[in-house]
Amino acid sequence: MSETTDVTKASQESLKYTIAQLGYSGLRVNNGIISEEIKRELQFPQSILTYKQMGYDSTVASALNYYEHMMLKSDMKVKPHPEATEQEKEYATFFQECLEDMEDQSWQDFIQEVSSMNKYGFCVNEIILRKRLESKGSKFNDGKIGIRKLPIRSQDSISKWEYDEEQNLVGLTQTVAKMGKRGKVLLSSKGEEIFIPRNKFLLFRLGKVKDSPVGESPLKACYYAWKYKVAVEEQESCGIHRDLSEIGRAHV
């Protein structure tokens, strides 16, 4: 006996496709602070101090220095494609000129600053442009817009990340402590807050879990081993001190 199936025409409402964004990555952001870590010591911005302390360890420092050295060994040259047009060749030449025409900053200096992401998980460098004029300190005098410098914005100076209603990163807030005489930091002052829009800085990061701007530091996986090592060393030093204090002295 044959079976029959009723087929009804789909409504126009069910055929509509929404092109707008509905969900988001799920990144936990509370008042500009990324709140993904369970351990407070590994949560930004406290993590910056933690990783800085870990960087004093000889084993950790050796690994970080090795990665920095390998990054500095890389040679950066902009070469056009063999089948590039004349205009594309001009673009490549112009970009190479910009990298070699930065003020008080070489390409190696820039890479060395970027290598700090190996410790902290991310690195922010502000984009500062200028007209290529000799009066502005440039090697060229064609009036084109070139790169003045790409200075780092230190990780411990970034206080929060700014997001819009659709959870898109729109910038960051940097807190710069006010300095007194002879470079002394005025601890009683809250410092000055500076907003840097997203199109004004480069963001380098290791890992993009939930598209987090702070990335994921390689030192995170070493944290418990490092903490245990520090605790054992402190216990050993206390034991050695006690043993030495019990050595008697004889006077003749």
Language-model regions: role of each:
Residues M71-V78, E83:
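Active-site acidic/histidine clusters and adjacent loop/turn architecture
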